[in-house]
A protein has these predicted regions:
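Sec-dependent signal peptide recognition
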Residues: 11-18
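N-terminal secretory signal peptides that target proteins for export/translocation
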Residues: 1-9
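Catalytic cores of secreted/periplasmic lytic hydrolases that degrade extracellular macromolecules
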Residues: 29-211
Length: 211
């Protein structure tokens, strides 16, 4: 008698579990997944960049693996620090550096020991470009030149001026975004689009590593 009662209880429990399982399969709604937040980097020259030094360095190394990680990490941090001082978008500045130097491969008029990362003054063999003492000062000059393009004459620098061409362009607000650099910073008709393409690659890279 006890054995039969035990079997009946087990059958009852099994039946209840089966009902619950079937209910969940046919009635429970699927919990919606939270959509992945897209990475949209600004193309504006003024403002704060979104990417960290680690993210910038990791992106850079995928395009030039011959540069030491420790160096490019410090170098990327220079861009973030210097850009922050002058309200310049560090993502834009870093992308422009990648374009101008071929991801620090150089190969044109400007040589690596010039510490010139944006082609300042590079015109011909007699004028190969401005030279700066250190990597950080070269980055600072780049940031200052972007600030000169993106602000009016009344906006002053926070760091000491080292860009020798700053006052040539710091009169009126010439540009607001990377596309305005076409025909102003460089004569290349696709200059702004080339920077945009690098920033787009940054967005894809960051999205992929977050998966």
């Amino acid at each position: 008698m006890k054995c039969k009662r035990r079997i009946d209880i087990e059958k009852f429990i099994f039946f209840i579990n089966l009902v619950l399982l079937l209910y969940c399969l046919f009635s429970c709604k699927t919990v919606p997944t939270i959509p992945e937040k897209e990475i949209n980097l600004s193309r504006e020259i003024l403002g704060k960049g979104q990417l960290s030094a680690v993210q910038l360095a990791d992106f850079f190394i995928t395009n030039n693996e011959h540069v030491e990680k420790e160096f490019i990490l410090k170098f990327a941090d220079y861009y973030i620090q210097e850009a922050s001082m002058e309200n310049i978008n560090s993502d834009v500045a870093f992308a422009q550096m990648c374009l101008e130097t071929g991801f620090l491969r150089f190969g044109g008029l400007v040589q690596p020991d010039f510490h010139n990362y944006c082609g300042l003054g590079a015109m011909d063999a007699e004028h190969p470009g401005e030279k700066f003492e250190t990597e950080q000062l070269g980055v600072r000059a780049h940031i200052q030149h972007l600030q000169a393009y993106a602000t009016t004459q009344d906006v002053q620098l926070n760091n000491q001026l080292i860009d020798p061409r700053y006052n040539w362009v710091h009169k009126t607000k010439l540009v607001t975004d990377i596309f305005g650099l076409t025909g102003t910073w460089a004569t290349d008709p696709n200059y702004g689009n080339k920077i945009d393409e690098i920033i787009s690659r940054m967005e894809v890279f960051i999205k992929n590593i977050k998966k």
